[in-house]
């Protein structure tokens, strides 16, 4: 099993829209997939740090959700470094619907981390 966390603008789960930045997104969609990339479980978690957060708070929260992977459109270099220290894979460059983004990640179309000028 792998736990993939996706930054979302809303609480619609896989039918929702990806957020533009992982740290200030209002929600995270937490998806557990099996070895065949089949979705086993989906849940939605509110981001307690959406309005304000200090260094490392959001990566620590995402890690506490059991994340093996965080998928977001963009992320700052400091956050990428935090996730690296926590052992969470970062995949950036996603846009559009959460479910389509998840499938793109599972298909290998989204991978690796490119830092943005944000936090």
Specify the residue positions occupied by each region the protein language model found.
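Non-catalytic interface/targeting segments
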Residues: 1-53, 57, 65, 85, ...
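Mid-chain, well-packed structural core segment of small domains
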Residues: 59-91
């Amino acid at each position: 099993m792998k736990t993939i966390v996706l930054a979302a603008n809303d609480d619609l789960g896989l039918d929702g829209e990806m957020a533009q930045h992982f740290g200030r997104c209002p929600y995270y969609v937490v998806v557990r997939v099996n070895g065949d990339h089949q979705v086993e479980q989906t849940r939605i978690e509110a981001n307690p740090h959406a309005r304000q957060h200090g260094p490392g708070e959001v990566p620590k929260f995402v890690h506490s959700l059991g994340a093996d992977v965080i998928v977001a459109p963009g992320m700052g270099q400091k956050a990428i470094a935090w996730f690296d220290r926590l052992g969470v894979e970062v995949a950036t460059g996603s846009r559009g619907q959460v479910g389509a983004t998840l499938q793109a990640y599972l298909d290998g179309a989204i991978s690796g981390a490119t830092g943005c000028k944000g936090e």
